[in-house]
Amino acid sequence: MNYFPWLTIIVVLPISAGSLILFLPYKGNKTIRWYTICICILELLITTYAFCYHFQLDDPLIQLEEDYKWVNFFDFHWRLGIDGLSIGPILLTGFITTLATLAARPVTRDSRLLHLLMLAMYSGQIGSFSSRDLLLFFIMWELELIPVYLLLSMWGGGKKRLYSATKFILYTAGGSIFLLMGVLGMDLYGSNEPTLNFETLANQSYPVALEILFYFGFIIAFAVKSPIIPLHTWLPDTHGEAHYSTCMLLAGILLKMGAYGLIRINMELLPHAHSIFSPWLVIVGTMQIIYAASTSPGQRNLKKRIAYSSVSHMGFIIIGIGSITDAGLNGAILQIISHGFIGAALFFLAGTSYDRIRLIYLDEMGGIAIQMPKIFTMFSSFSMASLALPGMSGFVAELIVFFGIITSQKYFLMPKILITFVMAIGMILTPIYSLSMSRQMFYGYKLFNTTNSFFSDSGPRELFVSISIFLPVIGIGIYPDFVLSLSVDKVEAILSNYFYR
């Protein structure tokens, strides 16, 4: 047991400091903005320090554990802890949220509330990744809903922002009902004393029918958030209307919470049901890659096209989770981190382009590479990362998932060949929509009626955010062990404890 409450500080600091924004004397947006950025940087530094000096990489068990009794009636504890599965997403959350706060600089309306909501999201995301109590996980999961709804409805850029915000909250709240039913069902089943402790629940056995019922409840909630087809339709609308700082948080972190939940709860707590349904996950993931890669080129809206590319990339994560192999699951975790960076960067650059040319439809753009060479260079680089160019993080992640499904002992040879073939088609379709997006934006003749003096290329802020994201994308592509070393022992423990015993 760890005696210094590192994780409690990391979870509580953002929302506590965010609440103080309301009491700060108003001296302009600049003060609030710098206060929020300083809180995010402080949080990231504390997290990095705690993980560097108090986390043992070669230990697959839960570390930095904290356990405080909260509600005695149904064994509800403030129970936190991290392992190799959660450390990567937590660091990703800190990194992307800090840059998203910097990206929100152009927003001047209701600046206090905006930054409070971003910090509240920060706490909810870190809390979800570090919870070791099922009900605490649910509460942290729900902490996301209202901030995202308000960020969409108040600072969204399009005419349909209220529609998109309502659609988001209906989908996610609907999924959360199934999540709550699963949480309460697991809490009340079996033992004389109800328990929500992950450790206890991992060793709990259920009748097959009941385990499948719980599995369905959880997978619906996580399928909405991931998203998994056909529960993905909120995502393009949400991304199409949201401010790009919100899009960075959605693409970089929020979608990854669904994938994390699939591994943490469906795989770890319900292994027999997962073993039964993993072939269906692989099939759905394969269909998702093809479906989203085929749908993306038909989108006129730039941000919707990037959103469909996110849906396609999430398909690789689902296949990795369904493969039930060391390589597949490690590849899925690497893809979670990799796409967190790439998705956030693409939305950021799409937003900075919109700030300058005030156009979001691709068929109205064209020929802006000459006026904005820095944005063109960065956008092209991240497009290459998105289509899994060798040397970048996406290539390594997708290659490891490929290897995982090919070497899986669970599937016969012909299904594996078919799945691999369809995945390869999806990877061929990815450059089609990625490169056509760049061509329509940056090449050709100038199609819009604006004077050249209107344009300004990327400033120091945009360059800093873009390069800060690009460096880890290249770093992971060249040396993926930097991320894989965090999760490899935990992945081995999950698979050996639950599938090969």
Swiss-Prot record:
Compartments reported by the entry: Plastid, Chloroplast thylakoid membrane
A GO CC term assigned to this protein in UniProt: chloroplast thylakoid membrane
Main location: plastid
Pfam families given in the database record: Proton_antipo_M (PF00361)
GO biological process, one term: electron transport coupled proton transport
Entry GO MF terms: NADH dehydrogenase (ubiquinone) activity; ubiquinone binding
Signal peptide residues on this chain, from the entry's feature table: none
Keywords linked to the UniProt accession: Chloroplast, Membrane, NAD, NADP, Plastid, Plastoquinone, Quinone, Thylakoid, Translocase, Transmembrane, Transmembrane helix
Membrane disposition: Multi-pass membrane protein
NCBIfam families assigned to the protein according to its UniProt record, in alphabetical order: NDH_I_M
HAMAP family xrefs: NDH1_NuoM
Family statement: Belongs to the complex I subunit 4 family.
Protein name, as recorded: NAD(P)H-quinone oxidoreductase chain 4, chloroplastic
Organism: Buxus microphylla (Littleleaf boxwood)
